Amino acid sequence: MLVILALAFLVAVGVGYAVVRDPGPGEAGTTPTARPTPLSEVDVSDRRVPRGPFCAALEQDAIEAALSGPVTRTEHYDSGDRARLASGLTDIAHEYNCGYFAATGAQARAWVFAAPVTRTAALALAREGAGTGCRQLSDAPGFGSPSAASVCRVRPGSATAVTLRGLFGSSWLSCQVSALRGAGTADLVRRAERWCVQVATTVGSRP
């Protein structure tokens, strides 16, 4: 099942490399504030994310901040639904996905695998997550443990996507913000970090 889900991601962004972060037990961050905050200023690795529907819990302000505009369309699906998992790939989903779209073409997504993921499997998923047209975020903060982050050209010359993914307990959570050509990469990275912080802190709970 994990192979199928990993393949769906690879179809979307190609084949390449990602940064894998496996923080030691001594690492710690500061307490998140109520406002969306860059990941570098918070510690979300100890969150426990449920493997179930969560779109209703996400805050509208955070979604619109990630899109840099209002939501014009949504694309949600649950595990067991037949859904478009990637461009040209429609199949039975084994994940819970929340997708939001703006009129500008910007997209914000968050999804969690329905099946539990072991630490060994998570390390493998983190290493294989990016693709051709991607580059690693060498200074990316941790998002779960282990975690990975990448910037990819989803459609060469037309869109860029920033994706963070990681293991929270036994849940493999991913989040992504993408925008059409013309959006600054640094701004897109900041928006993705804030979006991921919001998803993890809203959906996840402390043990």
Language-model segments: residues:
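A small/polar (G/S/T-enriched), proline-flanked helix-loop surface module common
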Residues: 22-207
